[in-house]
Design a protein with these regions (language model features):
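Short secondary-structure boundary segments
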Residues: 6, 40, 100-101, 159-160
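Extracellular/periplasmic bilobal clamshell ligand-binding domains
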Residues: 173-211
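Periplasmic-binding protein-like
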Residues: 30-39, 66-71, 77-78, 108-134, 147-170
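A bilobed periplasmic-binding-protein/Venus flytrap-type ligand-binding module shared by bacterial periplasmic
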Residues: 3-8, 51-52, 125-137, 155-156
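A ligand-binding cleft/hinge motif common to bilobed small-molecule-binding domains
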Residues: 89, 93-112
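Short amphipathic alpha-helical coupling segments at ligand-binding clamshell hinges
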Residues: 62, 66, 135-147, 155-158
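Extracytoplasmic ligand-binding site segments that recognize negatively charged/polar headgroups
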Residues: 1-92
């Protein structure tokens, strides 16, 4: 999601005629220069997914043009995907890109944080697994089975605001349902296979070229 500190936005950007962003392309507005932060895709998985999202959304050449233009607005890059939320929530910066569920959790604590889920957005599927040959395999199986119960899924929604995998468990209250989200055609296999090359290029052509 795009996250915005509403108080600073209304105080500093609204008077300039800037409208609340609705699309990925809205973040290219030069008015976001130095008030926008992001996580480094080479160190943050969530930022890589957002990077891959642009490639799937725009095609490779246009995506790199987009990322290089967006970089002109980036004050600096953080190491972790979640590291950007607090600086925006507290008003140190105005805007960023961050996981919706993590940002929503901070918003629920009373911060003036607005979440925008733009069209053609990406996603990740959280997973749990049993380690082959590990200790306590039977207990691990019991735990995995429990994770998939309605009780566990409702607990996950209530505490982490993550979307459930069960259709009989509702999405987090206050967030759109998955059916209401316009998802990009995100090819997970391609995202994995191109990751090394994309990150090398991001580091060489964007991170290494920053003043």
């Amino acid at each position: 999601s795009i996250i915005i500190n509403e108080e600073r936005f209304e105080k500093e950007l609204t008077p300039k005629g800037v409208k609340m962003p609705e699309t990925w392309d809205d973040l290219l507005d030069p008015n976001y220069k130095d008030v926008f932060v992001w996580a480094n895709p080479t160190t943050a998985g969530g930022a890589y997914i957002a990077t891959a999202c642009q490639i799937f959304r725009l095609g490779e050449d246009a995506a790199w043009d987009y990322l290089k233009t967006l970089d002109q607005n980036v004050h600096h890059y953080y190491k972790g995907a979640g590291d950007v939320i607090s600086p925006v929530a507290t008003g140190e910066f105005i805007a960023s890109i961050a996981w919706a569920h993590d940002s929503f959790k901070i918003q629920q604590q009373g911060y003036p944080l607005k979440l925008i889920i733009p069209k053609q957005t990406a996603y990740e599927i959280g997973g749990s697994a049993i380690i082959k040959g590990g200790p306590n395999t039977e207990n691990a199986k019991v735990f995995i089975d429990w994770l998939l119960t309605k009780e566990a899924q409702e607990l996950s929604v209530a505490t982490s605001y993550r979307y459930p995998v069960r259709t009989d468990v509702a999405a987090p209250a206050g967030l759109p349902t998955l059916e209401e989200v316009d998802l990009v055609d995100y090819d997970r296999d391609q995202a994995a296979s191109m990751k090394e090359a994309v990150l090398e290029k991001f580091d060489a052509e964007i991170i290494s070229n920053r003043a």
